Amino acid sequence: MKRIAFVFSTTPHGTAAGREGLDALLATSALTDELAVFFIADGVFQLLPGQKPDTVLARDYIATFKLLGLYDIEQCWVCAASLRERGLDPQTSFVVEATPLEADALRRELANYDVILRF
């Protein structure tokens, strides 16, 4: 079975990319357990709790990330450099537990996957 990586690199609620990526991730988890989630660039904002998407008439899907554990999705990585560049502390309480990795280590980890889907 191929190993699949889901990379979230866009801000939440500006487009449907984050919501569609999360839907695809949860659906794929029913087919394989060889997957991981990566949050890079503006995708780190997907991890923040307390967002108010209703102010831009968007659906609040961020809380759904909390289901990753129920779906046995345990490999979650976040780019430490992306957090720093956006003024976010790696010790912040995110909606899902994600391990911070520096960019070079994150690239090495991502290289272990056969398929990379970016949202």
Curated annotation (Swiss-Prot):
It is found in: Cytoplasm. Part of a sulfur-relay system required for 2-thiolation of 5-methylaminomethyl-2-thiouridine (mnm(5)s(2)U) at tRNA wobble positions. It comes from the Bacteria. InterPro entries: DsrEFH-like, Sulphur_relay_DsrE/F-like, Sulphur_relay_TusC, Sulphur_relay_TusC/DsrF. This is Protein TusC. PANTHER family: PROTEIN TUSC (PTHR38780:SF1). Belongs to the DsrF/TusC family. It comes from Escherichia fergusonii (strain ATCC 35469 / DSM 13698 / CCUG 18766 / IAM 14443 / JCM 21226 / LMG 7866 / NBRC 102419 / NCTC 12128 / CDC 0568-73).
